[in-house]
Amino acid sequence: MGEFLPLQGVRVIDVTTSLAGPYCTEVLAALGADVVKIEPPAVGDEARTWGPPFWHGESTMFLSMNAGKRSVALDLRRGLEVLIRLADGADVFIQSLRPGTAESRGFGPDALRERNRRLVYATIGAFGRKGPWREKPGYDPLAQAAGGILSLTGEEGGPGVRVGVSMVDQGTGIWAALGIIAALHEREQTGAGRTIDVSLFETTLALLSYQITGYLGSGEIPGRHGTAFASIAPYRVFETEDGEVMVAAGNDKLFAALSDVLKLDGVVDDPRFLTNPDRVAHRNELDEIIAAAVARWTTAALLAALEAAGVPAAPVQDVAQVAEHPQTTALGMVQALPHPRVPELRTVALPVSIDGERVGHRAPPPELGADTEAVLREAGYDADEISSLAGQGVVRVSG
C-alpha cells in the first residue's frame, strides 16, 4: 500500500453511525486524516451489533466501514463540554443525527464555528435539510424505494428488488467526503470553514441522473427490465449450461459478432434486428433466440469465444469468486489489517491508486473506547479529570 496522505494533520470528529457517515470518514482516514469516532459508551455504533456474519464476535459490517479510526466512548447528552472541546481543536466535524438535533443540543454548525471559524461542518441526513420530507428518518432501502431505484430493479411486471449492496449509503459517504475535501481546499484561501449537507435521497437523484433527464425530455417513465438495459439490446444476463454470462453487444458491429459466435443464421439481416432501436423494440423475441443458443454453451467456452470475437462479456460471479479472483489480487484491493480480536482480518482498500500504489487503510477498526484516554489527554484533560468523567459514566476508558 502506498503512503499517499494528503489529509495528514487534518483532525475529524465523527459523530455518525451505521454506514454512510462511517464510510465517508473511513475514506478520509485512508487519505491521512486523524478520525476520532465518537460512540455511545454502552454499545458503541449500532453497526457493531449488525450481523451475522460476525468474525470472532465482531460485526463484519462494522469492520468494513471503520478502518483507520480512533474510538472515543462519550455520552453526548452528558458530555457536551467534552464534545465541544474536541471540536475546538478539529478541522472537520461530521454528524448524522436527525435534522435539528445537533442544534438543539448545542453543537450545531453555528455554535461550533463561533469558537472555531475554520471548522468544516458536515451533516449526513436521510431526505435533505429542506422540503416536506426533511424530518423523515431513513436508511438505504428506504432511499432506494422513495428515490425511484426500486421502480427500476427487478423483472418486468414483478415487484421492485432492493439492490444487493448499500450503494446509496456508500455513495452518500463519498459525496460527503468530496464536499469536505473541497471545503478544506477552499479554507486554505479563506481561512473559514463551510457547512456541508448531503443526504441519501439526494444521492439517489444523482444516481438516477440519466433516467430523470430521459423522463423530463420524453415524458416516458422508465420501468423494470431485470438485468437488461432499457436503451440497448442485447445487453443482459443469459444462462449457460453451468452458470450465467452478462453480454453487452452495444452496437451493430458487436451484435453481428455475437450472432456469428452463436451461429444465429439470418438474425443480423432480420428486419426486426437491423439497428439498435429495432432490437430494443423487439427485445423479447431477440432475447429468446439468444437465450436458446447460449444455453448450449458452458460459461468458460462462451466467454472464450466471445473474447476472441471482441464481444464484451463477463461471468456472473459470487462474492467468494470475486474476493479470491486473480484480478482482485493483482490490484491489491483486499488488504490484511490485523485486529486485536480478528488477527486474520482482511477488508477492502480504496478503489484508487496514486502513482501506481494502492490507497489502503492505515490501521484496523478500533475497539470501543480504545482511544478515549489518549484523545482526552490531547484535548487538555488530565488524569484526574478523565477519571472523574469515567466515574460519572460520561466517558468509557478501555482497559
Enumerate the language-model features and the residues they cover:
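Oxidoreductase and adenylate-handling cofactor-binding alpha/beta cores
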Residues: 173-193, 206-218, 259-265
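Conserved PLP cofactor-binding pocket of PLP-dependent enzymes
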Residues: 307-328
